[in-house]
Amino acid sequence: MNMPRCLLHALTALSIASTLSMTGCDSGPRTLTIGVLVAQTGPSGARGKDLLHGASLAAEEINQGGFMVDGRPLKIQIRATDDKGEVEAAALQARDLIDTGIDAMIGPVNSNQAAAVIPIVAAKGLPQLITATSATLLALGQGNVLRLLANDEQQGRAIASFAAETLHSQRIAIVVEKSDYGRGLDASVVAGLAKMHLAAIASAEIDDKSQLPLETIARFRAEKIDTLVFLAREPQLVGLLDSLEKTGWTDLAVVGTNVIRNRSVAHRPLQIRALYATATAIDAKEFPEGKVFLESFRKRYGGDPVWGAQYAYDAVYALADAARQARSLDASDLVETLKRIDPGTKVNQQMRFAATGEQVYPNIGVYKVDHEAWAMQMMSATW
């Protein structure tokens, strides 16, 4: 039976329109949705906002065009939360972000929150990129957790090496936060010192809301401590420095970690011999390509990063490059590709993930307070 010509034309037009419509869908942008789960308020709020700013800046740059995945433009969507540095809030927000349909996660900031969140994200197999440094965190995942910087076991070795070989410390005391963070670092420092035939003369533990008692400081002074390794956070450090000044004990060096290396600490007048901090988060200006990032960051936010914005910035570029090279936004493809490639990061161009998820080149720096600023003293990936 012959089909009427008008009907044939109508069906042909419909077929062409349908084909064009499908082609249009196939050539439209692909969206990579990244959850940024960080503290934006509370004690870690400044660092969390810093990470969010870095991730958002990278997303804006990528979204301005030119980034393709399997022949289609890639768009980055950032979904941010504020866990306020609270473990329960972090776990709840992780579930909420996953329910909204994210493809990857950056954060949380600190190890306590990360320990609660990692199993939740691992159950979905999503790539999770973290700045939290507790050495045990990656084992809580299922191969999906990737650390953006060195871990605390490596940092502990660096502290021991610096104290023994650079400061030539002979009488060391260690102050340890009562947490997985503090105790993990302590174990690494003690092991590192033992390899150099040294041991701490004295030690003390404090929780995250207490200060080192004056009687403990007096005991350390009586032991003629020359170097105090401080494995706790900024509020406890401020209390320690206040107490040292009140007691008139200033002839010692204090060596802390990432968590004390803040502007507020550097701006404080110091009476002690020296204040150092090891850093797994290296300042952007220390990298050859950091200048370009800093110019963009200042233009966008009106000032310099306060901590590690460049790591979240690079994390977004690493995820985007993994999507491009995998030609996929599938979680397992992203994780596998991130561990296989040299991701196209912008600031730390040595960022490379081992099969374990740790960094292949885990740079650790040592900074010293000098003229109200943290000045780099040395940096190495092998301690």
Predicted regions and their residues:
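Extracytosolic ligand-binding ectodomains
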Residues: 2-18, 22-383
